[in-house]
């Protein structure tokens, strides 16, 4: 379960009280625009995230961001480009308009994702599965975890969601090794942007307790259709 901003504030305040020079760096992926403030307003010195997640509004094809203390942001830019150049130069591959439009759309798409996550939680709980967060509970990101307890069900759910995708719905999901994971991973990702998790998608490591992580969704109607189809297949 992710930390909410109140918890981040308590952690950062404690760290800074012990060492004011310590830098608190927060991975903000999946958490942008979910709460009414961001970690940099709650004691974090710098945050970073991906633009194929919340802030990209489902239309930005690649990229990421850093925000926070100007000195730290400039250091990150120097690491990205070169020392002495920093943020003064760089490329955006012509995606400037898409990035700005994605940021404009992001509050609405995050809202749809949150509604969808709550619906996913409610449906799976009704089917008898453990879910985290619980339906209608406070959320600090757009991810919904479901404990399926079965590799068969992992495959069944991922394949069903893939079949309900707007693109690549004809593909079969197969377990694959993914960098950063100890076990093979199953993914449902029929998305317009490759790898996008702000669009409706799911992934699940093939190991006990066989949890599946569902996230994203630009339209609540799509999530409803995917869940209806899944219920028919499970029952």
Give residue ranges: language-model regions.
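Conserved PLP-enzyme active-site core in the AAT-like
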Residues: 1-111, 115, 121-124, 128-132, ...
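Conserved C-terminal alpha-helix-loop-beta "cap" of PLP-dependent enzymes
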Residues: 125-136, 140-235
């Amino acid at each position: 379960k992710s930390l909410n901003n109140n918890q981040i504030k308590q952690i950062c305040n404690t760290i800074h009280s012990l060492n004011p020079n310590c830098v608190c760096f927060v991975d903000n992926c999946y958490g942008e625009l979910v709460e009414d403030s961001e970690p940099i307003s709650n004691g974090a010195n710098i945050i970073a995230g991906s633009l194929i997640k919340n802030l990209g509004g489902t239309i930005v094809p690649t990229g990421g961001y850093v925000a926070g203390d100007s000195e730290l942001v400039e250091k990150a830019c120097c690491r990205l480009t070169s020392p002495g150049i920093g943020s003064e130069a760089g490329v955006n591959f012509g995606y400037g308009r898409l990035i700005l439009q994605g940021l404009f759309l992001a509050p609405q798409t995050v809202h749809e994702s949150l509604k969808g996550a709550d619906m996913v939680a409610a449906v799976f709980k009704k089917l008898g599965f453990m879910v985290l967060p619980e339906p209608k509970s406070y959320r600090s990101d757009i991810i919904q975890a479901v404990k399926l307890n079965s590799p068969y069900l992992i495959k069944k759910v991922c394949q069903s969601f893939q079949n309900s995708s707007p693109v690549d719905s004809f593909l079969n999901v197969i377990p694959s090794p993914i960098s950063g994971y100890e076990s093979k991973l199953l993914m449902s990702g029929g998305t317009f942007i490759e790898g996008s998790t702000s669009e409706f998608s799911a992934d699940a490591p093939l190991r006990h307790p066989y949890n599946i992580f569902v996230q994203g969704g630009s339209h609540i109607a799509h999530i409803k259709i995917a869940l209806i189809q899944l219920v028919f297949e499970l029952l």
